[in-house]
């Protein structure tokens, strides 16, 4: 017997075992209690309710657009209106790591460290990269991209595959158009989303009056 960590990994296993009998794309909404071995603190609970929406079997960016629109619609229904959607792509982040000269096999470790930026700041990220023995030239090159906060979706195309930028811009434009500008979406190059199973588009929602993300 064990306590369920989240809803996403069991869904992946279910889909892998039953994909031939399921509709494609497979759309799921589920809600249940999940458990984490967390040190209890503000925003970190050992037991909480997870509401999950997933689209499996559709590799187009249309799935990402639908997920953002559905998420924000749900937030509107529970009374949250003053929020913004932050968006990035893990492939862009991987290309940034490569641009700095880091080895591909270190990407996950790098992502875990970089994901702490909101808590420890860019100087803290630099210090932790140094503590973990990463090459100083690579560290300096990486930190320089984020030091002044001026890395935009347009400028990041200079250090990553331009197709990733095009796809991300399409998502932003589509959400903006469908919502008639009611859903603010902004590119956030420092957005990581800690789980290792993220490989493409990632997003999270920040709302006024709440610390951390309220959805993602």
Give the residues covered by each predicted segment.
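Acidic, His- and aromatic-enriched active-site or binding-groove loops in soluble protein domains
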Residues: 1, 102-125, 129, 207-210
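Positively charged, Gly/Ser-enriched RNA/tRNA-binding surfaces
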Residues: 6-21, 28-81, 125-216
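Residue-level "edge-of-site" marker
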Residues: 88, 110, 142
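Amphipathic alpha-helical segments within well-ordered protein domains
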Residues: 72, 94-98, 111, 126
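Beta-rich nucleic-acid/ligand-interaction surfaces
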Residues: 87-99, 191-200
């Amino acid at each position: 017997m064990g306590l369920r960590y989240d809803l996403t990994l069991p869904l992946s296993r279910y889909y892998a075992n039953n994909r031939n009998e399921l509709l494609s794309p497979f759309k799921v909404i589920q809600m249940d209690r999940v458990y984490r071995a967390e040190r209890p603190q503000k925003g970190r609970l050992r037991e909480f309710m997870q509401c999950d929406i997933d689209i499996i079997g559709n590799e187009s960016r249309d799935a990402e657009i639908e997920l953002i629109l559905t998420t924000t619609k749900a937030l509107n229904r529970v009374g949250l209106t003053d929020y913004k959607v932050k968006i990035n792509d893990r492939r862009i982040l991987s290309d940034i790591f490569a641009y700095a000269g880091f080895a591909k096999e270190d990407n996950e470790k790098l992502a875990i460290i970089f994901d702490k930026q909101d808590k420890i700041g860019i100087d803290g990220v630099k210090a932790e990269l140094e503590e973990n023995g990463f090459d100083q030239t690579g560290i300096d090159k990486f930190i320089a991209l984020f030091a002044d906060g001026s890395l935009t979706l347009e400028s990041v195309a200079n250090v990553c595959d331009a197709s990733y930028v095009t796809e991300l811009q399409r998502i932003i434009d589509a959400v903006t158009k469908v919502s008639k500008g009611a859903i603010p979406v902004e590119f956030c190059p420092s957005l990581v989303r800690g789980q290792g199973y993220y490989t493409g588009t990632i997003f999270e929602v920040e709302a006024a009056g709440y610390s951390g993300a309220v959805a993602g």
